[in-house]
């Protein structure tokens, strides 16, 4: 079961921790220090 408070099915540009959260299955960091976003 997914953890409570974990967002799934996110749209492009939304903050993500892992690619499993994104509709596109692509979670990318633009730089090493920035937060990752769905692509």
Swiss-Prot record:
<dbReference type="InterPro" id="IPR017913">
    <property type="entry name" value="Colipase_N"/>
</dbReference>
<keyword id="KW-1015">Disulfide bond</keyword>
<keyword id="KW-0222">Digestion</keyword>
<keyword id="KW-0443">Lipid metabolism</keyword>
<dbReference type="Pfam" id="PF01114">
    <property type="entry name" value="Colipase"/>
</dbReference>
<dbReference type="GO" id="GO:0005576">
    <property type="term" value="C:extracellular region"/>
</dbReference>
<dbReference type="GO" id="GO:0008047">
    <property type="term" value="F:enzyme activator activity"/>
</dbReference>
<feature type="disulfide bond">
    <location>
        <begin position="16"/>
        <end position="27"/>
    </location>
</feature>
<comment type="similarity">
    <text>Belongs to the colipase family.</text>
</comment>
<comment type="subunit">
    <text>Forms a 1:1 stoichiometric complex with pancreatic lipase.</text>
</comment>
<keyword id="KW-0964">Secreted</keyword>
<feature type="disulfide bond">
    <location>
        <begin position="22"/>
        <end position="38"/>
    </location>
</feature>
<keyword id="KW-0442">Lipid degradation</keyword>
<dbReference type="InterPro" id="IPR001981">
    <property type="entry name" value="Colipase"/>
</dbReference>
<protein>
    <recommendedName>
        <fullName>Colipase</fullName>
    </recommendedName>
</protein>
<dbReference type="GO" id="GO:0016042">
    <property type="term" value="P:lipid catabolic process"/>
</dbReference>
<dbReference type="GO" id="GO:0007586">
    <property type="term" value="P:digestion"/>
</dbReference>
<comment type="function">
    <text>Colipase is a cofactor of pancreatic lipase. It allows the lipase to anchor itself to the lipid-water interface. Without colipase the enzyme is washed off by bile salts, which have an inhibitory effect on the lipase.</text>
</comment>
